């Protein structure tokens, strides 16, 4: 009992030690943080870290303060965030640290303003269900480069990224008067080591040690940590960094494993305490019960284990940022657009029953928890009229294709995301089984402008019957649904076709034309565009009035597959298979008065004249 009372005192101290940071670049440190004597020590006193993960890249910048206040009201004292390399290096050598959600300095300032410590997770590999695990896609095009290993070309690229990042965040470390108290080296590297046994363990360790050294060389002078499953410390732990556990429920295991790799002492932390789980298209929406979660949290509290809720607030994979997984039986498991994660704070920033259950417990340890902020206003948009259309085949008539004898990958075409239309003209008739086991994601096949069928790596459909008459055209519209972000195959995540298609086992080569459709910006239709043909991919465009902007959810349940832009912002992918059937439209993306909407519908089995904005998300409706 005396031990438990001591733990409670420590936790209460931890939760009240943060009166708020005032950040001034290069300022003298106002607070101190270190790992000492088996403890996290803040201003000379042992504390427990009660953190929540939120990725600034997945939350509109206008809502950062609201979400951080939601975390503070939950009873947390820190926020953890990944930095996704490819979110900031938008093209080779082109860096963006200032626009929209990319302004990491503004996010760190917001965290400081709200009195939250920051735990920075810069990778360079992040995972996080993010496109390519955070790596820029073009790394895979460098012939001499091997990612995530002791390779000069790769480590040189990592150093450039880390130096760029450090220039933005160095002065936000607690040693400089800022809120960042810890930085992570690499991420879940032990998992990769276990998956890549073809690489010697000493080579793996040389690489991870090099990443740690690059962080130090760039000016990170705060405690460093790693995060891995407790059974993977042999490959994941880095000398000089605190090992933390991911998803470990057993208190004794946590202490035993950390002690073994940290000089026999703590502190002990679960760096990823899973509030929910990730979600894939064509699979059920994952949930973790509040009861199971809070019972485990209580065990950590009783044992003095620090933790980081992964996720406390997931946010949204706007645009083409979602990643993908795979299994031995499923070639691709693309992640849905929503990163709700069944987290305590919903995708739209709402307090869930899980939030209330957690808060009730944490308030026992901290009497100064502020009130829960009000929700962002929610509106409905009953009828958004779609007044213009253009089928994609008409649109590409004015484009210049890439011509090649083979079917290049997206990467070979110099294209990171979006779509590519592969076209070939046949002077002789051919009929039989079209085989496309080299398709990386999803494609729709057309003959002379008529839809024939679909190719789908998600469901394992890689062949179909075709009949191509004399003097006819075969088209295949291929989508990149997100590069693999986890596992040994991350180094092989190419898009498009990695092998040529065959018809009746004969490779179809020669005279291919590729139309590149990156969709990096919303397509704009000219006045008078009204082209439409059922079955062909179509672009819809419309305008709608908003009297008072607020959050809403576009109801895409009756649509097929595609993406939506509102006022030029790509809200992400929709797909009728589910489980996600709505797209979150933050009110901060809307404006009072006229607003523009563009929908690219790939399947186009049903013609639409409107779309609606409803007040509740649909995230768990699976249609197979």
Predicted regions and their residues:
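Substrate-binding/catalytic cleft of secreted carbohydrate-active enzymes
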Residues: 120, 124-157, 163-309
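N-terminal carbohydrate-binding accessory modules
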Residues: 23-78, 109
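Aromatic-lined ligand-binding clefts that engage carbohydrates, nucleic acids, or primary amines
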Residues: 431-446, 474, 544-567, 574-575, ...
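Aromatic- and acidic-residue-enriched carbohydrate-binding clefts of CAZyme catalytic domains
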Residues: 43-45, 82, 87-95, 128-153, ...
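Bacterial Sec-dependent N-terminal signal peptides
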Residues: 1-29
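Carbohydrate-binding surfaces of carbohydrate-active enzymes
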Residues: 155-169, 176-184, 190-191, 195, ...
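Aromatic- and glycine-enriched glycan-recognition loops and surfaces
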Residues: 55-73, 92-112, 206-207, 458-462, ...
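Aromatic-lined substrate-binding rim segments of carbohydrate-active enzymes
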Residues: 64-131, 212-217
């Amino acid at each position: 009992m005396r031990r438990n009372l001591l733990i409670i005192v420590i936790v209460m101290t931890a939760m009240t030690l943060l009166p708020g940071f005032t950040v001034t670049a290069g300022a003298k440190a106002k607070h101190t943080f270190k790992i000492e004597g088996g403890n996290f020590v803040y201003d000379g006193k042992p504390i427990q870290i009660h953190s929540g993960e939120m990725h600034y890249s997945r939350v509109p910048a206008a809502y950062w303060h609201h979400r951080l206040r939601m975390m503070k009201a939950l009873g947390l004292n820190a926020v953890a965030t990944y930095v996704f390399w490819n979110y900031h290096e938008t093209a080779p050598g082109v860096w963006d640290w200032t626009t929209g959600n990319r302004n990491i300095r503004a996010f760190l300032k917001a965290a400081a303003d709200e009195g939250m410590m920051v735990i920075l997770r810069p990778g360079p590999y992040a995972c996080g269900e993010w496109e390519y695990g955070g790596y820029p896609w073009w790394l895979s095009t460098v012939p001499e480069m091997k990612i995530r290993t002791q390779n000069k070309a790769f480590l040189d690229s990592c150093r450039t990224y880390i130096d760029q990042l450090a220039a933005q965040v160095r002065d936000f470390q607690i040693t400089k008067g800022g809120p960042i108290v810890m930085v992570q080296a690499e991420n879940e590297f032990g998992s990769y080591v276990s998956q890549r046994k073809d690489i010697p363990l000493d080579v793996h360790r040389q690489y991870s040690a090099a990443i740690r050294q690059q962080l130090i060389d760039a000016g990170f002078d705060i405690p460093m940590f790693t995060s891995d499953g407790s059974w993977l410390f042999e490959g994941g732990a880095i000398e000089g960094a605190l090992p933390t556990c991911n998803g470990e429920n057993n208190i004794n295991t946590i202490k035993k494993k950390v002690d073994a790799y940290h000089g026999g002492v703590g502190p002990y932390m679960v760096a990823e305490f899973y509030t929910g789980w990730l979600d894939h298209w064509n699979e059920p929406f994952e949930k973790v019960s509040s009861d199971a979660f809070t019972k485990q949290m209580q065990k950590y509290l009783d044992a003095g284990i620090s933790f980081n809720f992964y996720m406390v607030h997931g946010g949204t994979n706007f645009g083409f940022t979602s990643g993908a997984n795979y299994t031995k039986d499923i070639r691709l498991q693309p992640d849905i657009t929503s990163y709700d994660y069944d987290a305590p704070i919903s995708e739209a920033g709402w307090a869930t029953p899980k939030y209330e259950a957690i808060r009730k417990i944490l308030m026992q340890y901290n009497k100064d928890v502020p009130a829960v902020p009000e929700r962002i206003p929610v509106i409905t948009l009953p009828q958004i009229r779609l007044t213009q259309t253009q089928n994609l085949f008409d649109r590409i008539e004015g484009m210049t294709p890439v011509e090649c004898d083979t079917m290049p990958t997206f990467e070979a075409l110099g294209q990171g995301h979006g779509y590519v239309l592969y076209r070939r003209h046949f002077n002789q008739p051919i009929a039989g089984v079209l085989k496309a086991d080299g398709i990386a994601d999803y494609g729709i096949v057309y003959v002379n402008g008529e839809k024939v069928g679909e190719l789908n790596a998600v469901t394992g459909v890689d062949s179909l019957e075709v009949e191509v008459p004399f003097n006819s055209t075969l088209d295949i519209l291929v989508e990149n649904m997100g590069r693999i972000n986890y596992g040994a195959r991350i180094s092989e995540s190419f898009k498009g076709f990695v092998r040529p298609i065959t018809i009746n086992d004969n490779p179809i080569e020669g005279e291919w034309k590729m139309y590149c459709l990156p969709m990096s910006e919303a397509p704009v239709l000219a006045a008078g565009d009204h082209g439409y043909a059922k079955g062909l991919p179509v672009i819809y465009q419309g305008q709608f009035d908003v009297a008072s902007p607020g959050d809403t959810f576009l109801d895409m349940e009756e649509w097929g597959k595609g993406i939506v832009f509102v006022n030029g912002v790509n809200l992400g992918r929709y797909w009728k298979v589910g489980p996600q059937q709505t797209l979150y439209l933050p009110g901060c993306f809307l404006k009072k008065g006229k607003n523009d909407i563009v929908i690219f519908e790939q399947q186009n089995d049903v013609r639409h004249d409107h779309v609606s904005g409803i007040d509740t998300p649909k995230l768990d409706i699976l249609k197979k």
